[in-house]
Amino acid sequence: MSTETELQVAVKTSAKKDSRKKGQDRSEATLIKRFKGEGVRYKAKLIGIDEVSAARGDKLCQDSMMKLKGVVAGARSKGEHKQKIFLTISFGGIKIFDEKTGALQHHHAVHEISYIAKDITDHRAFGYVCGKEGNHRFVAIKTAQAAEPVILDLRDLFQLIYELKQREELEKKAQKDKQCEQAVYQTILEEDVEDPVYQYIVFEAGHEPIRDPETEENIYQVPTSQKKEGVYDVPKSQPVSAVTQLELFGDMSTPPDITSPPTPATPGDAFLPAPSQTLPGSADVFGSMSFGTAAVPSGYVAMGAVLPSFWGQQPLVQQQIAMGAQPPVAQVIPGAQPIAWGQPGLFPATQQPWPTVAGQFPPAAFMPTQTVMPLPAAMFQGPLTPLATVPGTNDSARSSPQSDKPRQKMGKEMFKDFQMAQPPPVPSRKPDQPSLTCTSEAFSSYFNKVGVAQDTDDCDDFDISQLNLTPVTSTTPSTNSPPTPAPRQSSPSKSSASHVSDPTADDIFEEGFESPSKSEEQEAPDGSQASSTSDPFGEPSGEPSGDNISPQDGS
């Protein structure tokens, strides 16, 4: 027994000396050898384990230590003692074994230990916080010797593990960089690219290497994947959509006019001739015209669709009855040079703006825009046809200085069955205005063959084809004497079969807004008298001659 006791004492003293030497040597190699395998073993007693709310904190650890010591004091009064253990410190963490049985009681890995605290009241006691997030526990241990060497070993272990981890990460990163660099230069050699530096940058960025940097344009060219609708791309042409009345004028307050021809579906159709509805014979006789006019919506005082006319003027037929306006009728100027059918006027037709209130149309809004001379009288020997009843006028009548002379009028018998609003009165003409008298027998015979002139107040274009002309005679043979108006008779007959006006009633549009209370004035045509200031060929001014006669425009 004595020999065994001596051997144990000698081992203890040698272990103490070795621990001191090891404690003094804190090199990395020594620490690795020290904590390798089973590690360092210490004899101690377990005070207890308490659950805490946080992972670290001195006050937290001290409070938990005092609490566990109080529990142990209560158990000692009952005859219970602290459990004897021995703990090992290694790379695997802290392991607690039972001294009697040698069984493993607790094992806490290094990454689970978050805080180590020393008891300020007892130099042989210490504790550490371990556990995962939300499940932290404080382990209190009382060593057989001073607790400082155990705390220092734990500190060295943590520091060594941290340094080894950092070194390992650096080595892995260096190895990865080396592998990447080798792969990059291997790719450069295979692809035979001229710019290896740029190739390296592209490879590191994760893009594909440039295949063909042959020209300088490839460097500044925008990739196809980045081209968008805008700066680098030509904007695509948008298809022309159909234009409707609602799109042009918005929501109309009044229903559209269903009697007028439909609006062209596309902008290109606006220049095509519209279907002939008001002049049945015009399209068949003279063919399709070159220009058409789209209908105006009824919400903006629509006057009906303007059909293409071979006279260059724009007749408004259907809705002018409701608005108090009269259809235009081309004036016949005897003695002038005839103009071919469909020949455009010397002065372009002018589109007058539509008024927004009925009855407020200016007199010049419906002026004829083209002059068409009458055909020879021999063409009218047979029965009247719509072909010879639609002559027009040119702008010479509009530019005549005698525009204030009296106009021809018609009676109201034609519209006695219609209920319409009367147009606003126009100031009466001067009584001293001269009238035009024509003494040409050819012109008189022409009127005998054509028909009778009609009044223009509230006249409708549906009845113009039924008018008859009465012969008028010259009352003044002199070409210098003022003309006298010839009386006109109105025909009460109405017919909707023909919508073509007579050649002598071509100023119906000019006469539509004059007062119905005016006295009828007579006008007799004179084939040898001329008072026009502008001939059909564009001469703005000239002296009266016996070959041309200018129609008189209303004020």
From Swiss-Prot:
Q: Where is the composition biased (Basic and acidic residues)?
A: 15-26
Q: Where is the composition biased (Low complexity)?
A: 470-479, 490-501
Sites bearing Phosphotyrosine, chain numbering: 198, 220, 232
Tell me, in one coarse class, where this protein mainly resides: cytoplasm
Q: Give the UniProt keywords, A-Z.
A: Cytoplasm, Developmental protein, Differentiation, Neurogenesis, Phosphoprotein, Ubl conjugation
User: Where does this one sit in the cell?
Assistant: Cytoplasm
Q: Where is the composition biased (Polar residues)?
A: 391-403
Record has DNA repair as a keyword = no
- What happens to this protein after translation, modification-wise? Phosphorylated by FYN on Tyr-198 and Tyr-220 upon reelin induction in embryonic neurons. Also phosphorylated on Ser-491 independently of reelin signaling. Ubiquitinated by various cullin-5-RING E3 ubiquitin-protein ligase complexes (ECS complexes) following ligand-binding and phosphorylation, leading to its degradation. Ubiquitinated by the ECS(SOCS7) complex in the cortical plate of the developing cerebral cortex following ligand-binding and phosphorylation by FYN, leading to its degradation by the proteasome. Recognized by ZSWIM8 through a disorder targets misorder mechanism that eliminates misfolded DAB1 via ubiquitination and proteasomal degradation.
GO cellular component, alphabetical, reads:
apical part of cell; brush border; cytoplasm; glutamatergic synapse; intracellular membrane-bounded organelle; neuronal cell body; perinuclear region of cytoplasm; synapse
Q: What job does this protein perform?
A: Signaling adapter of the reelin-mediated signaling pathway, which regulates the migration and differentiation of postmitotic neurons during brain development. Mediates intracellular transduction of Reelin signaling following reelin (RELN)-binding to its receptor: acts by docking proteins through its phosphotyrosine residues and PID domain.
Record-linked PANTHER family: DISABLED HOMOLOG 1 (PTHR47695:SF4), PID DOMAIN-CONTAINING PROTEIN (PTHR47695)
* Known partners and oligomeric status: Associates with the SH2 domains of SRC, FYN and ABL. Interacts (phosphorylated on tyrosine residues) with CRK and CRKL (via respective SH2 domain). Interacts with SIAH1, LRP8 and VLDLR. Interacts with LRP1. Interacts with APLP1 (via NPXY motif). Interacts with DAB2IP. Interacts with ZSWIM8.
Q: What is this protein called?
A: Disabled homolog 1
Organism from which the protein derives: Rattus norvegicus
Q: Which gene encodes it?
A: Dab1
